[in-house]
UniProtKB/Swiss-Prot annotation:
Organism lineage: Bacteria, Pseudomonadati, Campylobacterota, Epsilonproteobacteria, Nautiliales
Main enzyme class: transferase
Designated name of the protein: Ribosomal RNA small subunit methyltransferase H
Cellular compartments annotated: Cytoplasm
Domain of life: Bacteria
Organism: Nautilia profundicola (strain ATCC BAA-1463 / DSM 18972 / AmH)
Cited HAMAP family: 16SrRNA_methyltr_H (MF_01007)
Translocase in keyword set: no
Keywords in alphabetical order: Cytoplasm, Methyltransferase, rRNA processing, S-adenosyl-L-methionine, Transferase
Gene name tied to this protein: rsmH
């Protein structure tokens, strides 16, 4: 893909930029999932005193982002690795103004058959990080019946998980996404939404996505300073539930167990405030332009340090 062909409008752009209106304007903005750099570009344009740390495990996407953000010079630094690892390595005294994580597969990754995410791909791959050895081929062909049932049921939220797993195991070895889609079609899963949930489950397992999200939240909390705003964009209910529940816990003053007769924790455990009572979602206009934005949800939290 040429740099000119990169999609220039990232998901929930206006909503995301608006979320950071009250962040400190002279520190670092950490984009945990840089992708093609669309959100970061908008932040750098709006806040001339902000410096950016752009993180992404996808070297291909980062190559494009470097070109896109080259005009900002030394205001930008890039880290090509998993966000959880990169955040752990940043100094805790770093003046962090904002943190963003867009927890989703880009349209480029989904549409590029060579990346092995699409139903039509000739490879069972689904790796965000191409240097990683473990791929969808390992999950589909070598996981036990019990482990496959676990991920299809929990990550794919599929009621027919036993039938799906039986069909997969009976046709091993499976070599391509297209072959997998055909196998699922023969048991009645022909609808794209149904197929997408099965592929989603495998992709989550390959990239350890839910554990990665939890680590991002944990490390973001460590780095946050007074006024730091954290924004998380999710694309399915499993991720959104993790973010929603984490922000809810962080906003609690009292963390005593429900059975406690009186507060014994001091009642001063609140880390900040939730900025989005309900998640921000795409407008009708954005959904028309980008149907995949329909499932995107943005939640925000601002840390308050005494």
């Amino acid at each position: 893909m040429r740099i000119e062909d990169i999609p220039h409008i990232p998901v929930l752009l206006n909503e995301t930029i608006g979320l950071y209106n009250d962040m400190p304007e002279n520190g670092y903005f950490i984009d945990c999932t840089l992708g093609f750099g669309g959100h970061s570009e908008a932040i750098l344009e709006k806040y001339p005193n902000i410096k950016l740390i752009g993180i992404d495990q996808d070297a291909e996407a980062m190559h494009f982002a470097k070109n896109r953000l080259a005009r900002f010079g030394d205001r930008v630094q890039f880290i090509n690795k998993r966000a959880s690892s990169a955040l752990e390595e940043l100094p805790e005294d770093l003046p962090v103004s904002g943190i963003l994580a867009d927890i989703g597969v880009s349209s480029y990754q989904l549409d590029n058959k060579e990346r092995g995410f699409t139903f039509e791909s000739e490879e069972l791959d689904m790796r965000m990080d191409k240097t990683q050895d473990f791929s969808a081929k390992d999950v589909v062909n070598f996981y036990s019946k019990e482990d496959l049932e676990r991920i299809i049921k929990n990550y794919g939220e599929c009621r027919r998980f036993k039938k799906v797993v039986s069909a997969i195991i009976s046709k091993r070895p499976i070599k391509s996404n297209r072959e997998l889609a055909d196998i699922l079609g023969h048991i009645g899963l022909r609808d794209k939404k149904d197929l997408a949930k099965i592929f989603q489950a495998i992709r989550i397992e390959v990239n350890n996505e839910l554990n990665e999200l939890e680590k991002i939240l944990k490390n973001a909390k460590k780095l946050a300073k007074n006024g730091t705003i954290l924004g998380i964009i999710t694309f399915h209910s499993l991720e959104d539930r993790i973010v929603k529940n984490t922000f809810k816990e962080w906003s609690k003053k009292c963390i005593c167990p429900p059975e406690a007769i009186r507060c014994e924790c001091g009642g001063n455990n609140q880390l900040g405030k939730i900025l989005t009572k309900k998640p921000l979602v795409a407008s009708k206009e954005e959904i028309k332009m980008n149907p995949r934005s329909r499932s995107a949800k943005l939640r925000g939290f601002q840390f308050i340090r005494g």
